[in-house]
Structure formats: C-alpha cells, structure tokens
Amino acid sequence: MKVKFKLFANFREAAKGKEVEITFAGSTVGDAIGALAAAFPAMKPLIYQDGRLKQYVNVLLNGQTVKGDQVASMPVNDGDEIALFPPVSGG
C-alpha cells in the first residue's frame, strides 16, 4: 500500500521534504506512521515516546483529525493522505 504524508515544521525538516510517499505492508494509520519513522530515523524521536505516539502529534487522514487513541486502529487505503504537524500556538 502507498500513502502520501504531508509534513509540517520539525517533521518536514526531519524527512527533508514537505511531502513524502511511503509504501508499506500494514493497513492502519499507525502502520503508515511506523513505516515513515523507519524510512526517516530522525523522525522517530519526534513522533514516539516510550514506543507510543507523542500526545502533541496532530494526525489528519484525508483532512479529518485522527485522535491519538484511534491512530493504531484507523484503517488507511492506498492513495490516502496523512498530515503530521505539531500543535499550533500563538498569542
């Protein structure tokens, strides 16, 4: 299966690009993110803490928010788009 990642801020820097296509054998958003981290090892500490997705990582699947507890089980289809970005803050 192949998905496209749109990456923002420090995720973009770690993957050296704003868009990355990843081919992987899994079927969930979590599997896709794991494949991304395997392809770009610099991303792993930005995404995971103690083997779990960091709380602050925002995940969108085809423009829809995927909550942290749904990432591991949310199905993904060939050609889907996953966006990863850190929280936005301002003042």
Segments (PLM) and residue ranges:
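Ubiquitin-like/PB1-type beta-grasp interaction modules and other compact soluble beta-rich domains
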Residues: 1-90
